[in-house]
């Protein structure tokens, strides 16, 4: 009886241990699930508040209220309001930059083999690709272009323009190395023309075009920009 009692205690202890471990795992899984759910609610509320009020006018208390949490709980997820804004727009920023860099590499490849015809085709393809990507992240670009005052992203368009200007200067170097005649534009001219280019693309977001309208307009814009670009460069 004594031995059986010991065995029963051991069995009971083992069962309790297993049960405790199971509950610990269950609590852990629940905690992870709750964290992820809360995180998503914060992102959703942040997106809604930023789109409605802009970054500067968005009140963190109202944002937390929309997510159903306290401000204390908010800081378990984000360091500050700026960190939340970054989380909402950074994937879109990085994605557009990656597509820009890939298109730039294709352009330089064509120039290096004197294939100017395909160079202009890349410009058209790139514009359409940009629109496709922008409309798959529409709210993020709306935040970038319309709601970013007070954030480090307020100069996003100028960053794209400056990148385009620098790559155009690199293109000039390659054209000269290849002995291809062209007309060189000044920095202010390049900035103005490239700013007009991106302003036209981003108009589709600022004025809430449908994706179909944006793509149709982009084809017209691509023909217009490409013809003008070739004309002013004498290519």
Model-inferred region functions:
Residues 6-53, 57-66, 79, 83:
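Basic, helix-initiating cap at the start of DNA-binding domains
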Residues 68-78:
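Short hydrophobic/aromatic patch on the recognition helix
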Residues 117-139, 191, 195, 199, ...:
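Amphipathic alpha-helical segments that line or abut small-molecule/effector binding pockets
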Residues 129-136, 150-177, 188-195:
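Amphipathic alpha-helical packing segments from all-alpha helical-bundle domains
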Residues 143, 172-224, 233-234:
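Hydrophobic/aromatic-rich alpha-helical bundle segments in the mid-to-C-terminal region
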């Amino acid at each position: 009886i004594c031995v059986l009692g010991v065995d029963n205690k051991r069995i009971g202890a083992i069962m309790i241990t297993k049960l405790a471990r199971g509950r610990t795992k269950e609590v852990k899984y629940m905690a992870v699930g709750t964290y992820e759910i809360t995180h998503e609610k914060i992102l959703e509320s942040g997106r809604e508040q930023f789109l409605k009020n802009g970054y500067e006018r968005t009140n963190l208390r109202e944002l937390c209220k929309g997510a159903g949490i306290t401000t204390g709980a908010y800081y378990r997820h984000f360091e500050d309001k700026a960190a939340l804004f970054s989380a909402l727009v950074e994937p879109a920023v990085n994605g557009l930059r990656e597509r820009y860099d890939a298109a730039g590499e294709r352009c330089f490849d064509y120039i290096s083999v004197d294939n100017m015809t395909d160079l202009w085709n890349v410009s058209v393809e790139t514009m359409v690709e940009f629109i496709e990507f922008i409309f798959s992240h529409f709210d993020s670009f709306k935040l970038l272009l319309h709601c970013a005052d007070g954030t480090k992203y307020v100069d996003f368009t100028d960053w794209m323009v400056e990148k385009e200007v620098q790559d155009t200067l690199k293109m000039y170097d390659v054209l000269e190395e290849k002995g291809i005649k062209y007309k060189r534009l000044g920095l202010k001219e390049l900035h103005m023309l490239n700013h007009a280019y991106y302003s036209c693309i981003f108009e589709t977001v600022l004025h809430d075009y449908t994706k179909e309208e944006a793509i149709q307009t982009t084809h017209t814009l691509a023909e217009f920009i490409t013809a003008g670009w070739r004309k002013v460069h004498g290519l």
